Amino acid sequence: MASSASSVFAAFDKDGDGKVSASELRGCMAAALGEEVSEEEAAAILATADTDGDGLLDHHEFMRLSAAHQLQEPAEESLRCLREAFDMYAEEEETAVITPASLRRMLRRLGSEHQRLEMEECRAMICRFDLNGDGVLSFDEFRVMMLMA
């Protein structure tokens, strides 16, 4: 996890000076969000985590900002995205479960490496997160699976 966080910091720190400027923050946020972030917005975001007041984020400040952002991500939005992903795999909206057959069907649609996936392999994938042993994944079981991924 720490190496992943360090990679994110390195990606934001374009000039490699060990600090993230408002300009670097702005550029990476625009790339990640797909929309422009103003210099003022980037500076305001940076200021919330700039504990030493130098106008830059060091690694520690950046990690704190990143953690705070993750905690503030609206639970409703996260839940909505999970529901959309679940619904792509679920058999029918009435039953709202992922069966081995619906998992196989969706994985085959996603790409050629899954074209030869056998039903038994799909059962095994579901079994790992099937908390109540009914052979299918409910939305709650899917949420647990995604949290562990």
From Swiss-Prot:
Under the heading InterPro entries, the entry gives: EF-hand-dom_pair, EF_Hand_1_Ca_BS, EF_hand_dom, EF_hand_pair_protein_CML-like
Q: Which GO terms describe its molecular function?
A: calcium ion binding
Acyltransferase: present as a keyword of the record?
no
| Coiled-coil ranges from the UniProt annotation | none
Query: Any idea which positions bind Ca(2+) 3?
Result: D130, N132, D134, E141
Please tell me where Ca(2+) 1 binds in this chain.
Answer: D13, D15, D17, K19, E24
Q: Which residues bind Ca(2+) 2?
A: D50, D52, D54, E61
**EF-hand domain boundaries:** 1-35, 37-72, 77-113, 117-149
UniProt cross-references to Pfam families, sorted A to Z: EF-hand_7, EF-hand_8
Q: Which UniProt keywords apply?
A: Calcium, Metal-binding, Repeat
Transmembrane segments annotated in the record for this chain: none
Fetch the SUPFAM superfamilies from UniProt.
EF-hand
- Keyword Amino-acid biosynthesis annotated: no
Q: What does this protein do?
A: Potential calcium sensor.
What name does this protein carry? Probable calcium-binding protein CML25/26
Q: Which organism is it from?
A: Oryza sativa subsp. japonica (Rice)
